[in-house]
Amino acid sequence: RQKLWRWENFPEDNQPMTADLPASLSMYPEYTFVGMELYFSPEGIPTIQVDHPMTRDPDMGLLKPVDFKNSGWMPRVLRWWDDVNHIVAGRLTVTNAMTWWRGCLDLAMQLRSYDKLMVDVYERPQFVHDLLTYLTEQRCRWWGAYSEYFGLKLKPTDIGDDWLNVPFISPGFFRDFVLPRYLEIETFHAGIASIHSCGDQTPLQ
């Protein structure tokens, strides 16, 4: 019904109507994987935690390793996957739509806040490198566990990094802090299929 409604109301949407059922609870599960709270209003508007302990204190010890089965919403995600498959009973292909899409910069901005992360670049650049490296490593570990759990092969990945645009960051910041992490993701997945941001990426290319 959702796909038919989308087709009827958004004719310019060129996404194919496939005979499968995505098992999804919402967008933004990655924030919960790294310890942030995520809430939705009755209208479906998300609110992401802005007062994580790391927002106040640039201490890497405040972050715990991500556990594929137990971190954040993952227990709910996996229960939902099992429940949907039980209901469908093989009549449709069920796809897991709750994946780690967000990039390292997006998560770092949410953990520290934009203003504080930009100050960190000048006052404690090694901390910024460590934070982005940690988030990238956790993302890759999560995808490795995801592929093993669902019996899938790793493939080129998509990345959503809303702050990956000028003037919020400079080409120099991207080159020195973010690009090395993207290259690690590219190596791990054997490619990057697409990168989404909410602004102008052209000066970064």
What are the residue ranges of the model-derived segments?
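Active-site loop segments of alpha/beta catalytic cores
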Residues: R1, L21-P22, I45, K64-Q205
